[in-house]
Amino acid sequence: MAAAYSTVGAVNRAPLSLNGSGARASLVPSTAFFGSSLKKSAAKFPKASSGNFKIVAQEISEDQQTDKDKWKGLAYDISDDQQDITRGKGMVDTLFQAPMQSGTHYAVMSSYDYISQGLRQYNLDNNMDGFYIAPAFMDKLVVHITKNFLSLPNIKIPLILGIWGGKGQGKSFQCELVFAKMGINPIMMSAGELESGNAGEPAKLIRQRYREAADIIKKGKMCCLFINDLDAGAGRMGGTTQYTVNNQMVNATLMNIADNPTNVQLPGMYNKEENPRVPIIVTGNDFSTLYAPLIRDGRMEKFYWAPTREDRIGVCKGIFRTDNVPEEDIVKVVDQFPGQSIDFFGALRARVYDDEVRKWVSEVGVDTIGKKLVNSKEGPPTFEQPKMTIDKLLQYGNMLVEEQENVKRVQLADKYMSEAALGDANQDAIKRGTF
């Protein structure tokens, strides 16, 4: 048996020849298992240098890599984590699954879905395009946003800036110009999103949009939450409007976020990770309709926007910047209608194009307008820019003012309730002789 073991041992431990070098016999351990008759042979060649033997992996050539290559996944990660997580739904403890399709198990199938639906991106430069930003407006907005990104010692900074004022004074557009100037793409919300058929949905949406803005800040880009016409969605407009649970929860949610701006959680999902602070900008016409504790000074900083004569002239220069209207004519138009909002002058400019549209309609015929506008091979018509003279601007401006006065003066709703007549509308036509 000893001979048998020796034979086996001698065969298994024969010197291995690798690249011309033999294994040295001294490396073979001496053990009783192999027997005493084991031959120990010396190396015939000197030991090779370990630095001469290298294993090198060739880099992947993207030109040779094709989409049909079944081994493509070895070099590139082509898995979809979202779908992998979704497949595991039902096998994960429900403690880690959030309700209402807001947890990690809900697959985001398109990369476009990662871009927030409320993200507003601007393609304008207020310097190049000639838009006017009121200095007082810009100062208030820039200081508020900057303060919220600073850590000032022992100072409680209001998270919300409420910009309010008359209708059509350019509050939202001035905000957008300042955002574009600062390089901010805000997360947008409007008053229509502050009510829903489902109780609690608007409050959840505010938290969701706030966290989306916080994620953008976390990635190193400034952002803010911008809510248009907050009073129209969350305020009480007299006894005729109903105060719903959603109105109450929107006010309460904004109060809670203002008190805890770095700990905003979605309903049903709670973790201890803090989120960046996101400044909130809201606009409205009358903040007295909002819940009073929301607009107190510690939570909301208020700014009443009433454009001065210089502001109105500056904005109107931007409105008529492509029409070659002389500056002195713009000043005359602004001074002629001192009580009108800034939006009035935009409507005035649009009204001047009525003559061009009327001329085009008479050329093509009323019965073929649909074919020319919607189903035309030539594309939509193009108009030459009409010449805007001071007389034409004043004429159309007076027409707009007259229509405003009719709405305020006639008030047909009261007439309909009291008698079957058209009120003073017919009286005007009788006086003009056109009845």
From Swiss-Prot:
Subcellular location, record wording: Plastid, Chloroplast stroma
Annotated keywords: ATP-binding, Chloroplast, Nucleotide-binding, Plastid, Transit peptide
Transit peptide feature range: 1-56
Record's GO cellular component terms: chloroplast stroma; thylakoid
Primary location: plastid
Keyword Plastid: yes
GO molecular function, one term: ATP hydrolysis activity
Keyword ATP-binding: yes
InterPro entries recorded: ATPase_AAA_core (IPR003959), P-loop_NTPase (IPR027417), RCA-like (IPR044960), RuBisCO_activase_AAA_helical (IPR048571)
Binding-site residues, ATP: 165-172
Role according to the record: Activation of RuBisCO (ribulose-1,5-bisphosphate carboxylase/oxygenase; EC 4.1.1.39) involves the ATP-dependent carboxylation of the epsilon-amino group of lysine leading to a carbamate structure.
Similarity section: Belongs to the RuBisCO activase family.
Protein's name in the database: Ribulose bisphosphate carboxylase/oxygenase activase 2, chloroplastic
Species for this entry: Larrea tridentata
